[in-house]
Amino acid sequence: MGKIVVSKEKAKTPLREIAGDASKLDQCLTCGTCAGGCPVADWEGMDPRKLVRMIHYGLDQEVIKSNWIWQCTNCQRCTWACPMGINFGAIITTARSLVPREETPGEIQKTANNHRETMNNMRLTVEDAVETFEWMAEDLKEEIPDFELPIDKQGAEFFCTINSKQPQYYPMDLMSIYKIFHAAKASWTISSRWWEGTNYAMFTGDFDTWEYTLREQAKRVEELGCKTMAYTE
């Protein structure tokens, strides 16, 4: 990497300012425990310990432009292993948030945009989603004759969320979810809107979309008067 000169001015970078306090960045002991458990350590010549050192040196742009921040799975093994409790997940997510949205690799930002625009990742319309939910409920009645699918039920205890890949590609998986709620004799419902159970904006660092989609979903929970969100993912 060559000789690095650190100045107070250079150290005051967006990544350090945003991630510093929340992630306990300054408490790093450089012990390397984080790197020892990281599944992508040494990819691109990087690991969690090196990431922290680069931020300390004010090398924001090098971090932000690194492919490694996208190779990280955000599994949090490094965070759990760290004796000082440094929140590496927060650091990675913050670094991703500073990458221009159009430069986000792959399809993950497109998926996040779909969620914001259509209330789910797969761009399913309300009509198509409800039709699939009801279709699987009808099939389940062959096994459980008294099963009734509660869609938009007011005052239910549980607001059930769904991974949109299920109604899109694996609709029969929905029956497993239905069976669990039915066997538990739970008060539950699936909403016709904002039922998406995943949030790709969390992985891209798109904080605006992340907050917007969560707030809209929470608003829907309140409209139906549900007490608990059940994330089936």
Give, region by region, the residue ranges found by the protein language model.
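Ferredoxin-type iron-sulfur electron-transfer modules and their immediate structural context
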Residues: 1-71
